[in-house]
């Protein structure tokens, strides 16, 4: 039986004394694989990987980052049937519905391809006597996203392509109920030539989520899910000084 591991620094790390939980096919009730449960230590290793990758990635020219985003879009389009099969197996939606989900996510990837070339600053001369004003946009650093069961590809594609196109590194925490398609997506990012550590993925439940919300080196968090959990994520992350967007109300 296959094991869905974390994705840290371009690999499935070899953590000791790991626990796993079952992943079921909703149509048959059959256990199809197992997923590793992440701990605070796993999150910390992912953050270290992202911090290491950040200087190289954020220092790339906008043109280079844009080309890599276009390559990622091309790979997802070519391999979308592989993603759709995994979505259907673990989520239960039809194959055509899964392809539709991927198509909506690709719209955001396409949008992200142009972002690096629009991160221009502003300059105004003589705003005061012998004073000029200059500003630019700088990436936040390490960001994180916590995504729901119902759209295991579309919602991650709402989050990390925009973040990494802006020069950030990103830690993704998908639902532990259907993580295989998301795990394959992380490998496509590496295939596109985006350096290891720019995108990391941590599996797990509340322990992994709390570690993300409380980690001192994660600057921002995005969440999509139910209203009660959105409220918890917002309050907990804000308590630790993070920028947060928590989209609640998900009910399908």
Locate each region found by the language model.
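Terminal low-complexity tails and localization/encapsulation signals of metabolic enzymes
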Residues: 1-34, 67, 71, 121-147, ...
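Histidine- and aromatic-rich ligand-binding microenvironments
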Residues: 6-7, 22-25, 31-45, 193-197, ...
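Generic alpha-helical secondary structure signal
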Residues: 18, 41-49, 78, 82, ...
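Glycine-rich loop-to-alpha-helix module at the N-terminal edge of alpha/beta enzyme cores
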Residues: 30-119
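Rossmann-like NAD(P) dinucleotide-binding subdomain of oxidoreductase/dehydrogenase enzymes
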Residues: 121-252
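An amphipathic alpha-helix/helix-turn recognition signal
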Residues: 24, 41, 45, 60, ...
